[in-house]
Amino acid sequence: MRKYKCLVIDPPWNQGKTGKRTVRPNQDLKLNYPTMTKEELLKLPVNVWADHNCFLWLWVTNSKDKKTKEPFLKSAFDLIAAWGFNFYTLITWNKKTGPCPFGPYQITTEQILFSYKGVAKFNSESLGKFQTMFTETSTAHSVKPASFYAEICKYFDGPRLDVFARQVRLGFDGWGNEYGKYEELIKKPHSLVKSKQILRMA
């Protein structure tokens, strides 16, 4: 089994939608993909994927579990600890747009828990290259900025794995039942539908 020095995990958190966005008013009020509970996410084979020294970028929204009401941010910290990672810092993506639920705040951000396993060995060229907040307009539900992945490829050595990936990205292997969803020119393997899981090499 191939071991990875970089993991990006964008979990299908057990949430619902808070309403239609003005930027994408044609969206349904229900998510169009299956979600996972915290207990299910804890069972992901992260220890199988991760190398002895490994970096992890774990995406998390500002919402909470629709059943347990536990904030996903708390769940995310529990996940990285259970997977054997140490928290390093919190990164914020300012999407500039988002839903406005029943309250004064429009939810325009998502968070990333940047963590490491083993020894955090940074490339000397990466020192001071990142800020803990970046701004880029959201283009579609759950689609993450290409610049985020490009920076990881530039400053962090591979192999790299994108977990619950939808897009095929240069420099990353992909894992998930919607891998390649947004790639018109890529034919999905039959096993993607059959097993609900697929590992594709970039």
Task: Describe the function of each predicted region.
Residues 1-202:
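Class I S-adenosyl-L-methionine-dependent methyltransferase catalytic core
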